């Protein structure tokens, strides 16, 4: 008999129904559950797949460079970044009539094109690329790296080159290499690129392979480094009248601590960025030599964990047993990695707009909005994934004997307290925030807006003042003009910071009021509720009050009727599933808040946000409805415009989102009935009945239907908001 899909599970391959296909797809990447899997093969498969992942990433970035070089207008954009619209790629569509061709021919192009809202133009410009040839060179290099990665993945699956399990479990060596190699050396290399290529380019000097060995990045070369006069590298920075990309007003400094923004580009000083990366490189190069390997120097992580006795014995046996628990569980390690990466991705979203690193990106409002929203959604999915794998760790890898009375076991012992406190915080935030919003709504509806409950966020304003924002009138720390911190700040460190924080043209420490106070607490409600669901799902993964014996049921068992006491919605997967809705909900509020506040800031009418954001009707009417007018107007009696594609996507996003409910609000019997009816009709229809299938069609399982529903809900939700965000922002600001 020929091998049927899935080859990794012979039991599933013999299933006579369509379940074979769906379960096969669902478990294709769950290597642990495959036939004949060994620990060694498991680690080797995952290791090899990392090379494939890298190959895809390099291929994708290569494609970005290639398409912009081929179909974009990079060289024209470089001449005038503020007024030329950057082109992502051409559009070839045989359906386009003349009005469509005219609507999408922009940015000086000869035919229809897409505008780039990804910020790649600003990024490439900042790091010193100037010509299409530079872009092609980068694309070819990344294509080469992609090929090398694929070869590496293939190579490490060959018997001679397969690493052993002991190699994968050598935590100290891996940590040393990742800290000093991945972070240290790459940061040092990036500092080198900034100093040798990007900073000269920002001063009008074109450094390439043919001349980089004879162009000194600093007039005194390496002299100051070897004589210990490092401060010379910070002297004579670019002046405030510097024109980026030219020598006009430029200096010679390469490593500075200026603070604030370049007045023309509104982005961080390149010399500050280089300094930052050099500092990071040194820190991580040192950190990468801290752990004991073959050389007998440095710390053993296991010794560190075992030696730590918590004060007063309040944490039981502390960290004993944790080293082996973590080192033998790839789910625990993945959970930690995803949690860290999720937080970092959200921080990227926050810092890309408040401290823009790329020249002129702060003046490209649509790109700013798109990048913020993109990174927040990515962060949400990564963070929920961290808890999913935390739950799988408890089910598959957690050994109570190994972890007796240590911090992990004690988390499980008092999980009721953790869950109930989170529940209490969520309820408090939800009822109070909604109560304030609804009260204010009613006051507006009754024509007495002066009776709203408006709370000034005085603690947050005090924190902003401590960082140097003077408009609130708090006389504290950096906003206290006669304090030592203020005086030191003028000269020693970051002299440009105080100018930047008090300038109202950027997004640093935006002025906040009662509307911000309310939406902040709405977001806090979303964060706490999402966390509650995720934490409960992970801590109850092995067993809960209703069902103490979940271990053998696995991660995603379905509803199993009243026979076993009713198992509906109590698998770890069900918690993850519910949490994703709350995560999307929360990020919706976050992005609504960010976008509305910035639209009013960019348009110069901040009072609209301040006055309308204190009640729900204000959000619905003055943010959502008012800004969707561009989308509703994509097609009208006068033909079409360049927003019509977003208008279509807005509708299509709603359709995908609504389709999700078809899967979410249904039951298995209905699906089976529907499929039987369709199969019956197919078999009795001439011509159609020539096509037969061997697998008997069966309904999706409850878990599968929920997954399909969740996928449609998520994709539709994000599609809809993406279209709204890009159309409403680009429609206003071009």
Swiss-Prot record:
Phylloquinone binds at residue 671. Signal peptide: none annotated. Chlorophyll a B3 binds at residues 662, 670. Its main location: plastid. It is a multi-pass membrane protein. The chain crosses the membrane at residues 46-69, 135-158, 175-199, 273-291, 330-353, 369-395, 417-439, 517-535, 575-596, 643-665, 707-727. One of its GO terms (molecular function) is chlorophyll binding. Belongs to the PsaA/PsaB family. This is Photosystem I P700 chlorophyll a apoprotein A2. It comes from Aethionema grandiflorum.
């Amino acid at each position: 008999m020929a091998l049927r899909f899935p080859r990794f599970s012979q039991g599933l391959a013999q299933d006579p129904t369509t379940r074979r296909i769906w379960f096969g797809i669902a478990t294709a990447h769950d290597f642990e559950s495959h036939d004949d899997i060994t620990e060694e093969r498991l680690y080797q498969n995952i290791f090899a797949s990392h090379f494939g992942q890298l190959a895809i990433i390099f291929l994708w970035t290569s494609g970005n460079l290639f398409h912009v070089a081929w179909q974009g207008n990079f060289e024209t954009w470089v001449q005038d970044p503020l007024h030329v619209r950057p082109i992502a790629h051409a559009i070839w569509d045989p359906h386009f009539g003349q009005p469509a061709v005219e609507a999408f021919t922009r940015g000086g192009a000869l035919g229809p094109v897409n505008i780039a809202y990804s910020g790649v133009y600003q990024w490439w410009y900042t790091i010193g690329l100037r010509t299409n040839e530079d872009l092609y060179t980068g694309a070819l290099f990344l294509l080469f790296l992609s090929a090398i990665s694929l070869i590496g993945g293939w190579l490490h699956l060959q018997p001679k080159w397969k690493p052993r399990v002991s190699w994968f479990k050598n935590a100290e060596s891996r940590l040393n290499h990742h800290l000093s190699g991945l972070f240290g050396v790459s940061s040092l290399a990036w500092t080198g690129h900034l100093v040798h290529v990007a900073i000269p380019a920002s001063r009008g000097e074109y450094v390439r392979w043919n001349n980089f060995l004879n162009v000194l990045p600093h007039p005194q070369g390496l002299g100051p480094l070897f004589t210990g006069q490092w401060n010379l590298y910070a002297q004579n920075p670019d002046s405030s009248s510097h024109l980026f990309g030219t020598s006009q007003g430029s200096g010679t400094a390469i490593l500075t601590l200026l603070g604030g923004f370049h007045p023309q580009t509104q982005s961080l000083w390149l010399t500050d960025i280089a300094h930052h990366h050099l500092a990071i490189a040194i820190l991580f190069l040192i950190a990468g030599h801290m752990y004991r390997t073959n050389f007998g120097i440095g710390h053993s992580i296991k010794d560190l964990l075992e030696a730590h006795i918590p004060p007063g014995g309040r944490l039981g046996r502390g960290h004993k047993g944790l080293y082996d628990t973590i080192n033998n569980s790839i789910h625990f390690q993945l959970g930690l990695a995803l949690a860290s990466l999720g937080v970092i991705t959200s921080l990227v979203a926050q810092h890309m707009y408040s401290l823009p690193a790329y020249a002129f990106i702060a003046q490209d409002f649509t790109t700013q909005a798109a990048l913020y929203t993109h990174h927040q959604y990515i962060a949400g999915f990564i963070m929920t994934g961290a808890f999913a794998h935390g739950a799988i760790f408890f089910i598959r890898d957690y050994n109570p004997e190994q972890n007796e009375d240590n911090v992990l076991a004690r988390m499980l012992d008092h999980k009721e307290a953790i869950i109930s406190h989170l529940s209490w915080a969520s309820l408090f935030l939800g009822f109070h925030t909604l109560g304030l919003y609804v009260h204010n709504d009613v006051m507006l509806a009754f024509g007495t807006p002066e009776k709203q409950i408006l709370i000034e966020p005085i603690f947050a304003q005090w924190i902003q003042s401590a960082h140097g924002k003077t408009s609130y009138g708090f006389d504290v720390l950096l906003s206290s003009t006669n304090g030592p911190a203020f005086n030191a700040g003028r000269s020693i460190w970051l002299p440009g910071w105080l100018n930047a924080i008090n300038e109202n043209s950027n997004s640093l420490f935006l002025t906040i009021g009662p509307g911000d106070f309310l939406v902040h607490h709405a977001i806090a409600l979303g964060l706490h509720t999402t966390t509650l669901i995720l934490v409960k799902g992970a801590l109850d993964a092995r067993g809960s009050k209703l069902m103490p014996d979940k271990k053998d049921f696995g991660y995603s068992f379905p509803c199993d009727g009243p026979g076993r006491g009713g198992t509906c919605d109590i698998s770890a997967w069900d918690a993850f599933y519910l949490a994703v809705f709350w995560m999307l909900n929360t990020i919706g509020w976050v992005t609504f808040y960010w976008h509305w506040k910035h639209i009013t800031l960019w348009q110069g009418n901040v009072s609209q946000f301040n006055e309308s954001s204190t009640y729900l009707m204000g959000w619905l009417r003055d943010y959502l409805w008012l800004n969707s007018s561009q989308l509703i107007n994509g097609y009208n009696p006068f033909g079409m415009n360049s927003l019509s594609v977003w208008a279509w996507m807005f509708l299509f996003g709603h359709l995908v989102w609504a389709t999700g409910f078809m899967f979410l609000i249904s039951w298995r019997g209905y699906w089976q009935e529907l499929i039987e009816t369709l199969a019956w009709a197919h078999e009795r229809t001439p011509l159609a009945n020539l096509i037969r299938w061997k697998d008997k069609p069966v309904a999706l399982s409850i878990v599968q239907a929920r997954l399909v529903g969740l996928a449609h809900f998520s994709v539709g939700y994000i599609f809809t908001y993406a279209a709204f965000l890009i159309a409403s922002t680009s429609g206003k600001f071009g």
